[in-house]
A protein has these predicted regions:
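AMP-dependent adenylate-forming
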Residues: 1-102
């Protein structure tokens, strides 16, 4: 199920962003997280899994050709694996902590 968010007045299905990233043969998996200030979404961050030496700037340029500008994430972070919580779901809070520690 896709998560619907609103950013700068645009409604965005986060799953659509993830799908475009995983359409790239270099990307094994992707998850996009909305970064909030209070209750307002201020930017999007996409975390990707890839075992390739992938150029993040090139990837962002490629994504910009298939997604509207307002759906292109501000930042892309490559990880070896996603953190999971005790319910075996991707731990989105931990992803935000990873992002903030960069």
């Amino acid at each position: 199920k896709d998560e619907l968010i609103k950013l700068h007045g645009f409604r965005i299905e986060l799953g659509e962003i993830d799908k475009e990233f995983t359409n790239n043969k270099e990307v094994t998996d992707a998850i996009t997280i909305p970064l909030k200030r209070g209750s307002e979404v201020v930017k999007l961050i996409t975390f990707i899994i890839s075992n390739k030496d992938i150029n993040i700037n090139t990837l962002k340029d490629e994504i910009s050709t298939v997604l509207p500008y307002y759906m292109v994430p501000s930042d892309i972070v490559k990880l070896e694996r996603f953190p999971y919580n005790s319910n075996h779901k991707i731990d989105k809070n931990e992803l935000i902590n990873i992002y903030k520690s960069l």
